[in-house]
Amino acid sequence: MSPRSTHRRFLAVLIGCLFLPLPVLAQVSEPQDYDSVDPGNHKPDVSASSPDLAKTAELITRLTNQFRARHNRHALTKNDRLSRAAQDFADYLARTDTFSHTADGKQPSQRVRAQGYEFCLVAENIAWEYNSAGFTTKELGHAFVTGWRHSPEHRKNLLDPDLDEIGVGVARSKKSGHYYAVQDFGRPQSKAVVFRITNEAGSTIHYTVDGKSFALDPHYTVTHQRCRAPELDFQGVRGKGDSEGDAAFEPHKGDHFTVQGQRQGGYSVDKK
């Protein structure tokens, strides 16, 4: 019996978009690791166990949601557009035996957008596995998810509370026998938190959104959009019912905050 050979590799990326009326800002964390596999004279063992790749992708989604449930996270919903993006990229990695989030010259955000997915957040996990003895469907699915679970950056994507949808692709290289898996996660643009602030007071007001400071002149309205649940703090402004101190809120989609002056001095904040 020939000795068993097992190899694996994992990469993760998170892409988030931060929106204000103008300008639009984007923040991307993108590892530039790149590997190209050269099997030399090695030929994949065609007699080795062969998993069902479509069922492996389904298993990865199921195991991911089970892992999220154990950590009090909501389940991710399968999205066809994310699934196509993930499968197309897995096929590319397998066809070229390359390993990088930008192996095809594109960012994950570009790949999902090309499939028509309008996102507020996108995250991606990729990995490859090899075992000379092959894998069953169950073994391969568990190998991928176990590897991601034990990697801090991949684990962060698996458990991100602000992600809502998932697509998974799995492919096998005919040249090297490596199995490649891609997880694309998303929060759709439709779930962005959009809220407004109107200054009806007689002077400029100051506030922060997620720690970033803003000043709003009288009679102006500003619209903020965030992909993650924001924190809003008005400095030196009292919320209705507050006896003292600054007014703090957790805005929801569609909220409208109006700041008004008070006869006795100071300001009040009304949320609708």
Give names to the regions the model predicted.
Residues 30-96:
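A short alpha-helix/helix-coil micro-patch that ends at or immediately precedes a cysteine
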